[in-house]
């Protein structure tokens, strides 16, 4: 089914964190995206765990698949993305689930870097499109400016479902100093964008408060993908305090607020998604 049509009648449960879960599960500090080439079964296993937990939507392991983070030329980044798409498809293996091309921020330093990054966002999006991916998830951004040209250009060439989510702190402001209200309004004003919302940055309780204050865009699908909670370093391990049961309870509040797309970011695991999936009402639309 077309994702737009599905979301008109049913909420969507996504996967949870990849990077923090990869680090904890495999006890490594390696960049997770490198495993698309070097450890494909490890990547596939995580996708499968989320699907088995109840996710109907998984994001490719490509959040940091860019030239700056991988320190490779774009030809190698392209291979990394292509491998990630194939791994995700192998994991889905006939299940009724969507695959989204995951695109995170490219680190920049100055106007020249920003211009290069804007072009690379388009090249990344095009690579996904050429692989047959029709859903793109631009996540954890501090503003819209850097990715907007790529979104408009790729949508002029391919039929895409575009998701854009921003990361804000508990006070509702991004690293660029922009409020959640402005970020959501700016993204909602772009015709090419289908879904807007927040991810990372805060736990589910603060995310509900921020979205309630910011207001939810009426003509776009709303996504809410919070962290498990707030991290603490214990015995050299990054830990998040909230339990899967607590997370699921708070996600009910986000669903009641009108969120159409619900999932988890840093610190969440398949157990978090599984706990959320157990509640029958999570898929119901709030009218």
Task: Please report, for each region that a protein language model flagged, where it lies by residue.
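Domain-level signal for soluble alpha/beta catalytic cores
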Residues: 1-287
């Amino acid at each position: 089914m077309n994702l737009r049509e599905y979301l008109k009648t049913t909420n969507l449960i996504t996967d949870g964190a990849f990077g923090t879960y990869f680090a904890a599960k495999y006890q490594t500090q390696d960049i997770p995206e490198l495993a698309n080439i070097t450890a494909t079964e490890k990547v596939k296993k995580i996708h499968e765990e989320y699907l088995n937990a109840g996710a109907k939507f998984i994001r490719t392991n490509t959040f940091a698949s860019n030239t700056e983070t991988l320190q490779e030329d774009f030809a190698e980044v392209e291979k990394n993305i292509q491998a990630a798409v194939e791994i995700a498809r192998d994991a889905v293996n006939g299940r009724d689930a969507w695959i989204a091309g995951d695109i995170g921020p490219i680190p920049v330093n100055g106007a020249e870097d920003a211009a290069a990054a804007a072009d690379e966002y388009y090249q990344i999006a095009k690579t996904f499109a050429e692989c047959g991916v029709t859903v793109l998830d631009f996540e954890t951004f501090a503003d819209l400016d850097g990715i907007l040209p790529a979104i408009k250009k790729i949508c002029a060439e391919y039929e895409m479902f575009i998701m854009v989510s921003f990361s804000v702190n508990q006070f509702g402001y991004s690293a660029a100093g922009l409020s959640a209200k402005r970020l959501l309004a700016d993204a909602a004003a772009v015709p090419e964008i289908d879904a807007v919302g927040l991810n990372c940055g805060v736990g589910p309780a603060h995310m509900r408060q921020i979205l309630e204050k910011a207001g939810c865009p009426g003509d776009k699908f709303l996504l809410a993908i919070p962290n498990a909670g707030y991290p603490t370093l214990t015995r050299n391990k990054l830990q998040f305090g909230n339990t899967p049961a607590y997370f699921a309870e708070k996600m009910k509040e986000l669903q009641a607020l009108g969120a159409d797309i619900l999932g988890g970011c840093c610190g969440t695991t398949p157990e978090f998604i599984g706990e959320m999936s157990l509640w029958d009402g999570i898929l119901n639309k709030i009218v």
